[in-house]
């Protein structure tokens, strides 16, 4: 980095001293500081150095403060909240389906920019979003929970569930891959480009898990979702076979069977609480 940014000896020694003194033998801390300095003009490096506190949690807290002061603070927090709760890393397209405020951002470079604003917590590799380290996710779920989940973790799970059902209702249809023939061998199926399931692949497999983890049995919206004529009832009546087809194309039938069993258990549990 020193060569690339053409640091003089004074700046190079100051950076080395600060990294050595404050890293506490944590390579990730060094990597995050260097990532920030990479985007810092050489003339501002010495001033910037003093803003990096020692220790990972302190550094994450500092980065969280920077996000909170940005113009996109609320959007970044919603992205962080969603990424912290998904059950596997999601692609940019899948993230747009889960976060309503991203719907109007059609430009891929803008989406990358938003993920970049969360760069101390998130990284983007081949269109898929990952945490830089498990400690970043742990920080959001514990120390920063009140800021990232102001209405509670369960509420974000429920939002992801409703967004998932919305994208599935819009994309699930008969013969999505244009296979035409019944009983087409699964091993011969080739993913078309563009993929009709690109935005809904995650939701297809995990929507029921988010419903179960929302655990909002006293919520009016939760209750109405499970009632006869509610959004789940309507979805299963209108899209159930297409959803099974989607699961098959996602190679998610085994997970779908488990999810349906979880949904049935949830309905029974809610019935005992006089929902119906």
Q: Where do the language-model regions lie?
A:
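Leucine/isoleucine-rich amphipathic helices and adjacent mixed helix/strand linkers
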Residues: 14-17, 21-276
């Amino acid at each position: 980095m020193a060569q690339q940014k053409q640091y003089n000896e004074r700046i190079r020694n100051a950076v080395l001293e600060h990294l050595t003194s404050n890293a506490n033998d944590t390579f990730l801390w060094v990597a995050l500081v260097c990532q920030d300095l990479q985007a810092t003009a050489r003339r501002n490096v010495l001033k910037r150095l003093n803003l990096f506190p020692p220790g990972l949690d302190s550094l994450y807290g500092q980065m969280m403060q920077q996000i909170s002061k940005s113009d996109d603070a609320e959007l970044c927090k919603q992205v962080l909240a969603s990424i912290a709760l998904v059950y596997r890393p999601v692609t940019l397209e899948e993230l747009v389906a889960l976060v309503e405020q991203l719907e109007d951002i059609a430009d891929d470079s803008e989406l990358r920019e938003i993920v970049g604003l969360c760069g101390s917590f998130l990284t983007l590799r081949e269109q898929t979003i990952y945490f830089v380290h498990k400690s970043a996710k742990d920080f959001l779920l514990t120390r920063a929970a009140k800021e990232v989940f102001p209405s509670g973790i369960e509420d974000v799970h429920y939002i992801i569930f409703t967004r998932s059902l919305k994208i599935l209702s819009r994309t699930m249809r008969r013969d999505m891959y244009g296979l035409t023939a019944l009983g087409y061998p699964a091993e011969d199926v080739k993913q078309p480009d563009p993929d009709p399931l690109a935005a809904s692949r995650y939701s297809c497999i995990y929507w029921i898990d988010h419903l179960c983890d929302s655990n909002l049995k006293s919520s009016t919206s939760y209750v109405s979702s499970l009632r006869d004529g509610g959004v789940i009832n309507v979805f299963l009546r209108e899209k159930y076979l297409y959803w099974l087809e989607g699961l098959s194309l996602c190679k998610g039938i085994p997970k779908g069977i488990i999810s349906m069993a979880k949904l049935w258990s949830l309905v029974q549990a809610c019935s005992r609480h006089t929902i119906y």
